[in-house]
Amino acid sequence: MKKLNSFVLDITVAILDFLYRGRDYQRFWVLEEIARAPYFAFLSVLHFRESMGLRGPEHLYLMKQHFEQSVNETEHLEYMESRGGNTYYIDRFVAKHLVLIYYWSNVVYYWVAPRLAYHLSYEVEIHAATTYAKYLADHGHDDKILEILNDELEHSRELEQAMEKIK
């Protein structure tokens, strides 16, 4: 299944690369819009599991982590909006439809195979960090982009910890 995760991510990245070539902040805005979806999905499933009496020992830790991650991704999203990332209707249209698919896919995936859902999100966070690093290499230093890059790397470490907690 990890190969499927990589395949799906590679296809999505190729599409985004094509659509957003030379449009960095629009691409970043779409990535940040999408980046929140798994954390919302994970929280939804954790709340549902709790309501069904299926809470595990890691439950509260994971809920706190995912809430903090979703807030952090929202801060990134707002920054990209301030840089004009959501100016065009087509970008908002693409992002909202990708989010809809990605959210519901993550709800099902997290319910059925949470470690694999975390792995996919881990790969997405690594891709985001790589994208920001490439931007910095091409455009020079930008404190806010560097901060966001470091946040994405921190999210990837948190996702690794989550995978360990639910063994």
What are these regions (language model features)?
Residues M1-K167:
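Non-heme di-metal
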